[in-house]
Amino acid sequence: HGLHILRNESDIQVLRNVIDLLGAIKYWSFAECGAWEEQNEVSRLSSIGIILAGLFKIQSYVKVPFELLQKGLSVFMEMFPNETTTRQYDLAQLFLIYPMNLLTGTQKQIILNNIEKNLLRENGVIRYLDDIYYNVNGEAEWSFGFAYLGIIYYQLGDREKAAYYYHKIIANSKDYNIPELYYSGTNTPNDNTPLGWSLALTIELAYLLNK
């Protein structure tokens, strides 16, 4: 967003250290807990994609070994569009579209179709099938899923669809008191209300729609 994050040579050295670490752990085949900070699993599409997007971005500041890009891209393309070997769909895959902007137009549409067909619910987007977090008679429905979808559709030029998702968010939220999630099939939010993540994305979507 135009912010100058790198202040001096010390900050540049931090980037070099991160690159060395990613190579040392072989990030493309590393077991980690992903965006939801849950069980470790090797090679998550969303995690590999986020790292790849970052590596591409910092190439103008530091040297990124070709192998780090080549290995990551190879595994990413082999896995796409599945999130892991055991999970096809995941809300975290939307991060690859926004804010990472990593995917081609066709890839974006595949991810959007998969999310809307399989994870979309009345009051939000479930993170993945059989998610046990706040699961009461079904997977919890996350408010910010609508915000991500709205922002993405706005960026794709579909203002009507973006507005549709914005109104879905605020339909159950009084005074922008937007929760983390709603219990499955209900208008009942959990106690993490309001959630800064949900609120920030909704404000961003509102800003875009009012430009």
Model-inferred region functions:
Residues I5-E9, C33-E41:
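Short, surface-exposed loop/turn segments at secondary-structure junctions
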Residues R16-W36, E67-W142, Y164-K211:
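Extended glycan-interaction surfaces of carbohydrate-active proteins
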Residues H1-R7, I50-K63, F95-G105, A147-D158, ...:
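Well-ordered alpha-helical scaffold segments within catalytic/enzyme domains
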Residues S10, S43-S46, P194-W197:
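Alpha-helix N-cap and loop-to-helix initiation/capping positions
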Residues Q39-T84:
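Loop-centered beta-sheet repeat module
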